[in-house]
Amino acid sequence: MKLENVNFRKVAIICACTMVVGLTVSMAILPELVNLMLRQNLRLKPGSDLRKMYEKVPFGLDFKVHIFNITNPQEIMQGGRPRVKDIGPFYFEEWKEKYDIEDNDGEDTMTFDMKNTWIFRPDLTAPLTGNEMITVPYLLVIGVLLAIQRDKEAMLPLISKGLDIIFEPLESAFVTVRVMDLLFDGIPVDCSSEEFAAKALCSGLDSEGAVAPLNDTHVKFSMFGLRNGTSIGRFKVYRGIKNVADLGRVITYNDETEMDFYDGDECNKYVGTDSTIFPPFLTKKDRLWAWSPEICQSLGAVYAGKSSYQGFPTSFFTIDFGDLRDDPVHQCYCRDPPDGCPPKGTIDLGPCVGAPILGSKPHFIGGDPKLLRDVDGLEPDPKEHDIFIHYDLQTGTPFSAAKRLQFNLELEPIRGHEVFGKLPKMVLPMFWAEEGASLNKTWTKQLKPLFMIRKFNATVKWLSIVLGTLGTIGAGFMHYKLHIKPVNVRPMEVQKTTVKEVEPSVETNGTGKEPPEKIEPRVVESAHRNLPPLFDGGLAGKQKPVPSDQRERF
C-alpha cells in the first residue's frame, strides 16, 4: 500500500480517540469498579470472611520482650548513673480474640470483649530459657512510693511503714528475679501481716488490679500475667457497612464514650481503631490511628515514603512521639504544661497505669539526647527499635508491622526516706516489648489478583498516553507532508542600472561671458531584461522624449 493512499487524518483521529478511551477506562471506570468490589468485601458483616478474621486473628502475632538488667544497683541507690544490659528477646505467640459479640444493625455497630493470649516459645527464645536471673526496679516498692509521693504525699509515711512490714528488710529499690516470674508467673508477696499499714497496702494493690491472689496469705505480681487470656475491656466499634470510612472505629470502651484521665477533651477522645483493622481508601496525608487501653492513648502513624514487601508495592508508615512542649493541642497529656510535659520522644503513662511510667521507643530512639546520656548501655538502632508499618492504602492491609514500646520509670529521691533518699532524678528504662506480624505467602497470594489488576491498569494508562500521543502526532505529520502542497514563489529579477555623469559644455553666446550655470540631465543607460510588466513597457517602455523647449528650463 502506498502512503499516498493512507488517510492519515483518520489515523490521527483514531489514535486520539484511543488515548481518550484508554485514559477514561484506566483512570475512572476500572478503578471505580475495583473500589466498588472492595466496598462490598471490606465490611464487618456477620458471616463474611473479614468478620471471621476480625473476631479471631487466624495466626499468632509475634510478641517479643527485652528486659534491661541493672548491673550496678548499689551505685544507683547512692545517686550513681545506671548501667544496663538488654537481655532478650523472650519470644511469645500472641493470639487475639473477640467474644460475647452483639450486633446493632440500626447503629451499624458491634460490641465485644477482647482478650490476648500469650504462649511462650522456648524454641524461638533459645539460647535464652526464661530462667535467667535479672535485676530490675521493683515496681511494688519504688513504683508505689514514687506514685504516692507525687499524688498523695500525706500518705507517704503510712505506705512506707506498710512496705517495711511486707518486704522486711526493705533495703533496695531493686529486686533480682527469674525472667518468667517477672513477666508471667509472678513474684510472691506476703500479705499475711495483721498490721493496719500492711493490710491497707495489700488491699490497695488488689483493688488496683496490680496483683493476683496466690493463696490465702500471699499475692503475686507480674508484668503480663494478670492480662493473659483475660478480657482487656468491652469495645463498641463501627462495622463499616453503611460507611466504609468508619470501619473498626472505636465508639465506646467499657460503655464510656470518652476517657477521664486527662484535663482536655482532645486527649480523652477515642481516636482510631483497636489496631486489629484499619479502613481502606486512605491517602498519604491520612494517619493510621489506633487507640489502646494498655496506654490509654491514641497513636497515629504517619506516611514516611514508598516501600515494598515481597514484591508488593506498599506505603511505609511510622510513629514519632514528638515533643509535647511544641504541641499546644495535645498538652492535655502533660501534668503541668508546658514545663510539666514529658521529655521529647516520650509519653506519660502515669494516669493510665497508676505509676510514674513513661513510654518511649526502645533505647530512646528519637528522644531527648539527655535520656541517653543518663544511662550507660543503650544502643539505639532504627532497624531494631523503630515503629513501622508496610501498608496498602487502598485495601487497608498491613503487610508487615512492628509496634515497639519501651516502659521507663521516672526515678527520683523519696523525700525524707533513709533508704531511697539518694536516688538520682532520671528516666530509667525497665523493659520493651514488640508486637508484630508479617503476612506469609498464604495470605499475600489472596491479594495478588488485585495487584495484577493494578499493574494491568497502569499499563493501559501509559500505553494509551504514549502510543496515543505518538500515533496522533505521527499521523498528523504524515497528513501534512502528503496533502499540504508547498507554494513555489519565483524570485523577482531586479533591474540593473548604470549611471553616467555628462560633462557640461561652456557657451559664451558671443558675449564673452559664461552663461548661468545649468543643470544638465543625467543620461541613464538602462540594462533591463525580463522585467515585470510594471517596469517593462510600463514606465521604461513608455517614456516620452522631453521637448527641446522644456529642456531649456533646466
UniProtKB/Swiss-Prot annotation:
Its main location: membrane. Residues 32-457 are extracellular. GO terms for biological process: sensory perception of smell. Disulfide bonds join C267-C332, C296-C352, C334-C341. It comes from the Eukaryota. Coiled coil: none annotated. GO terms for cellular component: cytoplasm; plasma membrane. Residues 1-10, 479-554 are cytoplasmic. Glycans are attached at N69, N215, N228, N440, N457. Residues 514-528 have a biased composition (Basic and acidic residues). It is found in: Cell membrane. It holds the Pfam family CD36. Keywords: Cell membrane, Disulfide bond, Glycoprotein, Membrane, Olfaction, Receptor, Sensory transduction, Transmembrane, Transmembrane helix. Residues 498-554 are annotated as: Disordered. GO terms for molecular function: scavenger receptor activity. The keyword Transmembrane helix applies. The keyword Transport does not apply. The chain crosses the membrane at residues 11-31, 458-478. It is a multi-pass membrane protein. Belongs to the CD36 family. Plays an olfactory role that is not restricted to pheromone sensitivity. This is Sensory neuron membrane protein 1. It comes from Culex quinquefasciatus.
